[in-house]
Amino acid sequence: MTEIKLSGINEKGEEKEFSVSDFKGKKIILYFYPKDNTSGCTKEANDFKDNMNELTKHALVIGVSPDSIKSHKSFREKYGLNFVLLSDPDHKLAEKYEVWKEKSMYGRKYMGIERSTFVLDENGKTLKEWRKVKVNGHIEEIISFLEK
């Protein structure tokens, strides 16, 4: 597997470069979202933040979007987010997980992130995936899966 390196901010808000191998040995909830500071993405991020105590019993949470580090820092500070946010402007990781898709809004076609979540085991193998995620009720689906 090709090592993908992305810039991001850690759970403390510090900027750093991350690679997939940094997370080896840890179970991960990897979630892809379209854009910082938009209504659905903000609700989803707050759902992760508000359930962090339960989630971290099982896995590390990592959010990924094409947004810049500056945007991620602002998003994190505005909502008090407490997990890793990765910046994927060239959509390398999004393409690896096949979540960089053609979308359509008001008849206009464009490429963007298909809201998706993956639970990965300690070796990076996908245990569960949700695609075309609807934010309402999604955090409960994740917790239910993790508690099995």
Predicted regions: what is each one?
Residues 1-148:
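Chalcogenol-based redox active-site neighborhoods
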